């Protein structure tokens, strides 16, 4: 199961000596030693938890779940990412050592899912916060699909060049989502917020111990004054 074709490895010479490069050797060593950081916020994470059991046995891929981002090289986001949790997710990603990879699991993580229509607190895709290597659609994806995503990621690792991976880090995207809510007649007289969010993701240094949420999202709230009597 762990066998992987290694395209960059040179053929064995007549003297039975295998010649390769340091980059190829590094990629080969990381194929069966991916240490994931499990970032589960919703029901998709239950499907990933089933991989730990004996039926699917993800240990055969060399996956060792870690609880610290400083010891992980893969973060698997499963579930809805809210704007309140976005700074924490970016901070976890920045604390991971290079090279690092991201698997976006589930429709809610990739596009916001059913919450993307008119939700004031849902991020429309985790790729607006961190770069994604493998997209895994589904609601929720099956455990077999997760294993297929891990296999595709391992193929990508076997073919990449370390210097290119470091140099091609994508910058955080900027996006704006406007929400306009109308006050229902049954709520007239109550305190209601009509919020217009201008969300700009600001690049932060990985050495920053704490990243405040106000550095990521700027809120412009218009609060109408109603008679509370």
Swiss-Prot record:
Annotated compartments: Plastid, Chloroplast thylakoid membrane
UniProt superkingdom: Eukaryota
GO molecular function, one term: 4 iron, 4 sulfur cluster binding
Chief subcellular location: plastid
Entry-linked Gene3D superfamilies: 3.40.50.12280
Keyword terms of this UniProt record: 4Fe-4S, Chloroplast, Iron, Iron-sulfur, Membrane, Metal-binding, NAD, NADP, Plastid, Plastoquinone, Quinone, Thylakoid, Translocase, Transport
Record's catalysed reaction(s): a plastoquinone + NADH + (n+1) H(+)(in) = a plastoquinol + NAD(+) + n H(+)(out); a plastoquinone + NADPH + (n+1) H(+)(in) = a plastoquinol + NADP(+) + n H(+)(out)
EC number(s) per entry: 7.1.1.-
Cofactor(s) the record lists: [4Fe-4S] cluster
Cofactor annotation comment: Binds 1 [4Fe-4S] cluster.
Protein residues bound to [4Fe-4S] cluster: 43-44, 108, 139
EC category: translocase
Membrane-topology annotation of the record: Peripheral membrane protein
Keyword Thylakoid applies: yes
GO cellular component, one term: respiratory chain complex I
SUPFAM superfamilies attached to this UniProt entry: HydA/Nqo6-like (SSF56770)
Any one Gene Ontology BP term: photosynthesis, light reaction
Keyword ATP-binding: no
Record function comment: NDH shuttles electrons from NAD(P)H:plastoquinone, via FMN and iron-sulfur (Fe-S) centers, to quinones in the photosynthetic chain and possibly in a chloroplast respiratory chain. The immediate electron acceptor for the enzyme in this species is believed to be plastoquinone. Couples the redox reaction to proton translocation, and thus conserves the redox energy in a proton gradient.
The family this protein is said to belong to: Belongs to the complex I 20 kDa subunit family.
Complex formation: NDH is composed of at least 16 different subunits, 5 of which are encoded in the nucleus.
Protein's name according to its UniProt entry: NAD(P)H-quinone oxidoreductase subunit K, chloroplastic
Organism: Piper cenocladum
């Amino acid at each position: 199961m762990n066998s992987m074709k290694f395209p960059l490895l040179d053929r064995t010479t007549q003297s039975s000596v295998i010649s390769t490069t340091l980059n190829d050797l590094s990629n080969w060593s990381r194929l069966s030693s991916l240490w994931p950081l499990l970032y589960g916020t919703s029901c998709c994470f239950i499907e990933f938890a089933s991989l730990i059991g004996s039926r699917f046995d993800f240990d055969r891929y060399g996956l060792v779940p870690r609880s610290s981002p400083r010891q992980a090289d893969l973060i698997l986001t499963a579930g809805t990412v809210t704007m309140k949790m976005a700074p924490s997710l970016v901070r976890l990603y920045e604390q991971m050592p290079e090279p690092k990879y991201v698997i976006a699991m589930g429709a809610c993580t990739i596009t916001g899912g059913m919450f993307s229509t008119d939700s004031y607190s849902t991020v429309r895709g985790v790729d607006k916060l961190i770069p994604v290597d493998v997209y895994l659609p589904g609601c929720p994806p099956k455990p077999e699909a997760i294993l297929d995503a891990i296999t595709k990621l391992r193929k990508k690792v076997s073919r990449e060049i370390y210097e290119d991976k470091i140099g091609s880090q994508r910058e955080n995207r900027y996006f704006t989502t406007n929400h306009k809510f109308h006050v229902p007649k049954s709520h007239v007289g109550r305190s209601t917020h009509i919020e217009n969010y201008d969300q700009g993701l600001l690049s932060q240094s990985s050495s920053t111990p704490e990243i405040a949420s106000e550095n990521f999202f700027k809120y412009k709230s218009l609060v109408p004054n109603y008679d509370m009597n």
